[in-house]
Amino acid sequence: MSGMEWFPLLGLANRARKVVSGEDLVIKEIRNARAKLVLLTEDASSNTAKKVTDKCNYYKVPYKKVESRAVLGRSIGKEARVVVAVTDQGFANKLISLLD
């Protein structure tokens, strides 16, 4: 489980209702300046990846890539997810430090 220190923290953020999942909802959070960090899977489609990363770059929201959609979904207790946004600055800062 090396390199997966972020896994339980994202689950905790989800239980605290500080995580939004799904492409449309994440883009809405980015536009409304509520997203503090976006997690995107490496197996996301090129169209989805471009759309999300372009929004993050334009609105200056940091984003990180994680292994797969199954891992990301499992970390928040749901089915496979391609993109999630963290809406709390404290959780976002800790996740950034763990993912670097």
From Swiss-Prot:
<protein>
    <recommendedName>
        <fullName>RNA-binding protein YlxQ</fullName>
    </recommendedName>
</protein>
<comment type="function">
    <text>RNA-binding protein that recognizes the K-turn motif present in ribosomal RNA, but also in box C/D and box C'/D' sRNAs.</text>
</comment>
<dbReference type="InterPro" id="IPR004037">
    <property type="entry name" value="Ribosomal_eL8-like_CS"/>
</dbReference>
<dbReference type="GO" id="GO:1990904">
    <property type="term" value="C:ribonucleoprotein complex"/>
</dbReference>
<comment type="similarity">
    <text>Belongs to the eukaryotic ribosomal protein eL8 family.</text>
</comment>
<dbReference type="InterPro" id="IPR029064">
    <property type="entry name" value="Ribosomal_eL30-like_sf"/>
</dbReference>
<dbReference type="InterPro" id="IPR004038">
    <property type="entry name" value="Ribosomal_eL8/eL30/eS12/Gad45"/>
</dbReference>
<dbReference type="GO" id="GO:0003723">
    <property type="term" value="F:RNA binding"/>
</dbReference>
<keyword id="KW-0694">RNA-binding</keyword>
<dbReference type="Pfam" id="PF01248">
    <property type="entry name" value="Ribosomal_L7Ae"/>
</dbReference>
<dbReference type="GO" id="GO:0042254">
    <property type="term" value="P:ribosome biogenesis"/>
</dbReference>
